[in-house]
Curated annotation (Swiss-Prot):
GO terms for cellular component: cytosolic small ribosomal subunit. It comes from Chlamydia caviae (strain ATCC VR-813 / DSM 19441 / 03DC25 / GPIC) (Chlamydophila caviae). GO terms for molecular function: rRNA binding; structural constituent of ribosome. InterPro entries: Ribosomal_uS15 (IPR000589), Ribosomal_uS15_bac-type (IPR005290), uS15_NS1_RNA-bd_sf (IPR009068). One of its GO terms (biological process) is translation. The gene is rpsO. This is Small ribosomal subunit protein uS15.
């Protein structure tokens, strides 16, 4: 279960900090969030898929680490991103 190229490009354009930004924490977190959302939907349809469940936990951990990094380096960007992605923090 991976995001197609068009979806990634759309997310990148929406969250990039400048024109050529493709790897900032903001973009990575947004892509991970979309991927997590898709995996959650998949797990609703296939609750016995343990490999996808483990992949979901791994992605959530990656996103959590990136969010912690962003919060420690630029709190204002962190708060803005949390609001834009409708995350619970």
């Amino acid at each position: 279960m991976s995001l197609d190229k068009g979806t990634k490009e759309e997310i990148t354009k929406k969250f990039q900090l400048h024109e050529k930004d493709t790897g900032s924490a903001d973009v990575q977190i947004a892509i991970l969030t979309e991927h997590i959302t898709e995996l959650k939907e998949h797990l609703k349809r296939s609750p016995k898929d343990q490999n996808s469940r483990l992949a979901l936990l791994k992605l959530v951990g990656q996103r959590r680490k990136l969010l912690e990094y962003l919060n420690s380096t630029d709190t204002e960007r962190y708060k803005n991103l949390i609001t834009r992605l409708n995350l619970r923090k």
